[in-house]
Design a protein with these regions (language model features):
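Residue-level signature of outer-membrane beta-barrel architecture
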Residues: 1, 27-29, 43, 60, ...
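Transmembrane beta-strand segments that form the barrel wall of outer-membrane beta-barrel proteins
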Residues: 1-13, 35-45, 65-76, 100-110
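Membrane-embedded beta-strands that build the outer-membrane beta-barrel scaffold
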Residues: 5-7, 27, 37-41, 58, ...
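Outer-membrane beta-barrel domain signature
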Residues: 10-16, 42-47, 71-75, 112-118, ...
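Outer-membrane beta-barrel proteins
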Residues: 16-19, 48-50, 79-81, 97, ...
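Residues that define the transmembrane beta-barrel architecture of outer-membrane proteins
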Residues: 19-23, 50-54, 78-82, 119-125, ...
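Hydrophobic, well-structured mid-protein blocks that either form specific transmembrane helices
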Residues: 40-88
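Outer-membrane beta-barrel "beta-signal"
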Residues: 127-133, 163-177
Length: 177
């Protein structure tokens, strides 16, 4: 059994504020040689009201060495969604690693306050080049990400004057201890 704290965020340089900030506290238990079941809580601080979700999911290593993370979320208001993340790492050396990622989110109910429509919400594809330091505990990275919104979520974004598709340069660090 292990407990993990996962945090990811998007910082808008022009606005000098976080666009999104997602925090998860999960407990994981092995269910097979390559997969863990997990349960926990997720706390989001998007543009608009904060959201708290219960989380159930699985994470592990699929055939062909793809890392997979699939989660089901239910908010205290009953809004539910699912997310699947897949990542493949290509090792150039023991320290230089290129990661290709694909994330997809589906909402089972609409939440207009945070701009989420029912159905396929968004996909995000990306490439990150990182350099593992200090026994892989600290890994700075640079990369590029393409994000696209679909269906009702795209309609809500357009109504607010936003776009449905964007490219981002990313820089950050992966920290594990």
């Amino acid at each position: 059994f292990k407990v993990r704290l996962l945090t990811t965020g998007e910082y808008e340089i022009e606005e000098q504020a976080y666009e999104t900030l997602e925090n998860q506290l999960v407990g994981q238990i092995p269910i097979s040689k390559f997969f863990d079941a997990k349960a926990g809580v997720r706390f989001d601080t998007p543009e608009g009201p904060d959201r708290t979700y219960a989380l159930l999911g699985i994470a592990g290593l699929a055939p062909q060495w793809f890392e997979v993370d699939a989660n089901l979320y239910v908010s205290k208001d009953g809004d539910s969604s699912a997310e699947i993340d897949a990542e493949y790492e290509l090792l150039f050396t023991n320290y230089w690693i290129l990661s290709a990622t694909l994330d997809a989110t589906v909402a089972f109910s609409e939440d207009e306050e945070i701009g989420v429509g029912k159905g396929l919400v968004s996909t995000e594809t990306g490439l990150r080049l990182r350099y593992d330091l200090i026994d892989r505990a600290f890994s700075p990275y640079v990369g590029v990400v393409h994000e696209r919104k679909y269906g009702d979520t795209a309609d809500l974004a357009k109504a607010e004057g936003g776009g449905t598709e964007d490219w981002f340069a990313v820089i950050g660090a992966r920290i594990a201890f």
